[in-house]
Amino acid sequence: MSEADRAFAASWWLVDGLVRAGLEHACVSPGSRSTPVALALWRHPAVKVHVHLDERSSAFFALGIAKASGRPVAVVTTSGTAAAELLPAIVEAWMSRTTLVALTADRPPELRGVGANQTIDQPGIFGSFVHVSIDAPVPGDAPDEERWREL
């Protein structure tokens, strides 16, 4: 299985797990690192995808959908400072007890802290304004379906 196929498989299982937990909408700000997740969301029949070029606007749009629907909404960004653009909406969601699921792509761990393009210290970026923060592993040679669905 190619690296791209492994990334898509893991992303599909992640998205399917989120759908099983009530996800119906996702707001995507396209970027190369988040492509597997964006494609999985786009191809999932239960998810309505909203594309926004600006990450901050996308996050607030997602917050509006989540508040209106009472259901979790995903917001997807690529790596680096794109993830930081979500913080204002994440704080608003936290304060209003509204569920946003931030899916922020990142560089592989070996590219962190070495000056790689679009790389910041992403794990834990939202601090105390989230219930859970997971630094998902790079999908291995045989991604574990159940593990990715449970993330």
Regions found by a protein language model. Give the residues of each.
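N-terminal alpha/beta PP-like core and its mobile active-site loop of ThDP/TPP-dependent enzymes
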Residues: M1-L151
